[in-house]
Amino acid sequence: MAAYLQWRRFVFFDKELVKEPLSNDGAAPGATPASGSAASKFLCLPPGITVCDSGRGSLVFGDMEGQIWFLPRSLQLTGFQAYKLRVTHLYQLKQHNILASVGEDEEGINPLVKIWNLEKRDGGNPLCTRIFPAIPGTEPTVVSCLTVHENLNFMAIGFTDGSVTLNKGDITRDRHSKTQILHKGNYPVTGLAFRQAGKTTHLFVVTTENVQSYIVSGKDYPRVELDTHGCGLRCSALSDPSQDLQFIVAGDECVYLYQPDERGPCFAFEGHKLIAHWFRGYLIIVSRDRKVSPKSEFTSRDSQSSDKQILNIYDLCNKFIAYSTVFEDVVDVLAEWGSLYVLTRDGRVHALQEKDTQTKLEMLFKKNLFEMAINLAKSQHLDSDGLAQIFMQYGDHLYSKGNHDGAVQQYIRTIGKLEPSYVIRKFLDAQRIHNLTAYLQTLHRQSLANADHTTLLLNCYTKLKDSSKLEEFIKKKSESEVHFDVETAIKVLRQAGYYSHALYLAENHAHHEWYLKIQLEDIKNYQEALRYIGKLPFEQAESNMKRYGKILMHHIPEQTTQLLKGLCTDYRPSLEGRSDREAPGCRANSEEFIPIFANNPRELKAFLEHMSEVQPDSPQGIYDTLLELRLQNWAHEKDPQVKEKLHAEAISLLKSGRFCDVFDKALVLCQMHDFQDGVLYLYEQGKLFQQIMHYHMQHEQYRQVISVCERHGEQDPSLWEQALSYFARKEEDCKEYVAAVLKHIENKNLMPPLLVVQTLAHNSTATLSVIRDYLVQKLQKQSQQIAQDELRVRRYREETTRIRQEIQELKASPKIFQKTKCSICNSALELPSVHFLCGHSFHQHCFESYSESDADCPTCLPENRKVMDMIRAQEQKRDLHDQFQHQLRCSNDSFSVIADYFGRGVFNKLTLLTDPPTARLTSSLEAGLQRDLLMHSRRGT
């Protein structure tokens, strides 16, 4: 009784009498009538109702006259005569439109079971598909209870003599059903219920003194004795899945719940129980105060009908009484259409309509019963948004009462639904750092925190100086356990001075840039930073060395240089003292790291020399920088021996062949540092012979001038002319060098004699004896050439006269063809044949095979073609001469015209490569004469 009195009572149901329908509009029972219909009468059922049930959209009643009545939602009562005497039991299936009834058709104890198919009709009444006697044997006994399995394969009937019969098979047909006695006992059976769990079917049997269960889906029907306490008629029920389909037995002292194999919890609801019913998670108990005891426990519902009876609706999960009211003489409690209906002995039907969830919650809120509201919302399957709203209101209530610890626990339950800033603002204003920390921790744990939340939580830890919590927060075992923005955490910890914690996060979560920033800028641990870079993958090691290389080079130059050497040759990340030497290495572009060595020339030289030795294919910038560095060292060195060594190194580098494509850059470097040997070497490699000559001339190195001419004069003959001009301007006695130059000029015929004389005329020390031998030899050669030319002219004139005579003879005299052999095949000439005026004759088939033109002699055609090409060239050159003279006269810039013609090669000497030596003279003949010569080869007929 004490436990029962502690349960709170609420009015979560609305009670009203069901009225008769005003029209056939299908209004729900218990609905409030419209205004103006106050005269509506309350619904009154026929007298003598003894049993009730519900399902399939109707309330079903049985009376003492043998009739069964149906009350659908339209409240249009209908019935039919089911038995001749009375109806004692009804069971309406919920999943099938099948009704099972027990009644009497004759006097005496002979109950009949009838199965009705409500979907089929027989003379306007439901079709009775099966009738059989309830008593299996010959001993008369009264039926006390009835239950049917929803699969229509089991039906159990309990009797007052303590026996239970089980009908197994299709209960709607006689031939498919088998009846047997399942249970025999000494106490009246007061309740039966089937429970289906997977493929196993249990039958609960309760009597006035005990509770037991059977497995009826097998063959042997094993029995389990559950308890030695029983209950009265209609005081047992089967719960829904919310209570795990437990069998409820309502005794006078307690209400017990049973599983098929054991007893479950019990509730101390005192009072003499009359009815037990289960409805949508609620336990409905109709009881009478124990102060008014009935004459018989088994037949108490029929005694003292004028007593007041209490109906309580219990919420067993949330442990409160959802509704409590008083009725006079309750016949039964039914559930249909989402409501409860209470039938009283006076024929009235009372509707108990459950309030909606929001209304119930508001009632609890008004009483500040938030815990109960939460439990209720969960049992009513309220969505997460609705629950979050309750948690928020509960938290606000606790916060207003000063219970900050309790409030934050409720706010934590709103995470994911309630905006975090709402909670954060409350605890920031109240300076409740501990509570705020708890909320933020959970926010991160659920991976719903942003960068601002992480910042705030870490600030809370630092203000509380709670290093243990801070370490617990950041030191997670795996990446999946991290519920915060790591980069934000690193920033906050760094700003707060928790460098070791920030380093831990940066290293474990691969935030390499932050790790190096803290090591280099805050802790100044350059060795550790360099070691860390050496462990990184190639791409990250490369990028971080470019970013932090200058700082590291400034503080630890040797170690930094060593790492750069490895990075640019064959880089493999170090893995805690070991490295995978078999894995293929990577290498960076060494040229990109040269700026890191600013102000560290010693390390730069070591790096560059290492790269040039280990990787000869290093970028050109490596060699350019190394050359510049060596030249700088050479220029600033004072020690002669060291300077000579540096000189050799620079020359060796220049001769390595790495500066062919960057000749100009290397030359500029050598000139900047006055490295003359390098300049001369590069001049020679670049074929800049003029510059070599000028260098030796500037330094008056006469022998070197002659040497340059001898070595490179074949490639650039103008060197000899420049040498002659150079020595001619010298006032010193340079006869030896002038003679050497003149000898070469004479041999190669590089200058006209007059120009040689004019050039040497500028030298006051040069006498006629210097050039006497040269002039004599030149005059002799010219005399010989003149004699040869005169002889050639006479010969050509005679040849011209002869040819003209032949032409005249061809024009004036007949031509006799006396050739006897073909000029192509040298065989005897036969008809048909082809003859030409030039004297050549051919077989016709030979001519057709070898001739390129029908009008030209195949034998003379090559020579004739040369002559024609020469004529065309002369005519073209004459036309160009006229055009050139015209443009020269009309142009304002004569020099540009001349330059344009030079660029087009107009003034180049015309030479036909196929011409024999005699062709040069032929080219001087008149064009008209040349055309006449071609007549020798015209075809004769």
From Swiss-Prot:
One GO process term, biological-process aspect: endosome organization
CDD domains of this UniProt entry?
Answer: RING-H2_Vps11
Return the CHCR repeat spans: 411-561, 572-736
The chain residues annotated with the modification Omega-N-methylarginine are 904
One GO term of the cellular component aspect?
late endosome
UniProt-listed Gene3D superfamilies: Tetratricopeptide repeat domain, YVTN repeat-like/Quinoprotein amine dehydrogenase, Zinc/RING finger domain, C3HC4 (zinc finger)
Q: Which residues carry this modification: Phosphoserine?
A: 813, 924
- What Pfam families would the database entry show? PEP5_VPS11_N, TPR_PEP5_VPS11, VPS11_C, zf-C3HC4_2
Q: In which tissues is it expressed?
A: Ubiquitous. Expression was highest in heart and low in lung.
Mind listing the GO molecular function terms for this protein? nucleotide binding; protein domain specific binding; protein-macromolecule adaptor activity; syntaxin binding; ubiquitin protein ligase activity; zinc ion binding
List the residue ranges forming a coiled coil, or say none: 772-813
Keyword tags? Acetylation, Autophagy, Coiled coil, Cytoplasmic vesicle, Disease variant, Dystonia, Endosome, Leukodystrophy, Lysosome, Membrane, Metal-binding, Methylation, Nucleotide-binding, Phosphoprotein, Protein transport, Repeat, Transport, Zinc, Zinc-finger
| Zinc finger (RING-type) in chain | 822-861
Which residues in this protein are found as N-acetylalanine?
A: 2
Where is it predominantly found?
other
Which residue windows are transmembrane per the record?
Answer: none
Disease the record associates with this protein: Leukodystrophy, hypomyelinating, 12: An autosomal recessive neurologic disorder characterized by developmental delay, spasticity, truncal hypotonia, acquired microcephaly, intellectual disability with variable seizure disorder, accompanied by thin corpus callosum, paucity of white matter and delayed myelination. Dystonia 32: A form of dystonia, a disorder defined by the presence of sustained involuntary muscle contraction, often leading to abnormal postures. DYT32 is an autosomal recessive, slowly progressive form with onset in adulthood and generalized involvement of the limbs, trunk, neck, and larynx, resulting in dysarthria and dysphagia. Brain imaging may show abnormalities in the basal ganglia.
Task: Return the similarity comment.
Answer: Belongs to the VPS11 family.
Q: What does this protein do?
A: Plays a role in vesicle-mediated protein trafficking to lysosomal compartments including the endocytic membrane transport and autophagic pathways. Believed to act as a core component of the putative HOPS and CORVET endosomal tethering complexes which are proposed to be involved in the Rab5-to-Rab7 endosome conversion probably implicating MON1A/B, and via binding SNAREs and SNARE complexes to mediate tethering and docking events during SNARE-mediated membrane fusion.
Assembly state and interactors? Core component of at least two putative endosomal tethering complexes, the homotypic fusion and vacuole protein sorting (HOPS) complex and the class C core vacuole/endosome tethering (CORVET) complex. Their common core is composed of the class C Vps proteins VPS11, VPS16, VPS18 and VPS33A, which in HOPS further associates with VPS39 and VPS41 and in CORVET with VPS8 and TGFBRAP1. Interacts with TGFBRAP1, MON1B, STX7, STX17, EZR, RDX, MSN, ECPAS. Interacts with RAB5C. Associates with adaptor protein complex 3 (AP-3) and clathrin:AP-3 complexes. Interacts with PLEKHM1.
- Name of the protein described by the UniProt record: Vacuolar protein sorting-associated protein 11 homolog
Q: What is the lineage of its organism?
A: Eukaryota, Metazoa, Chordata, Craniata, Vertebrata
The gene name reads VPS11
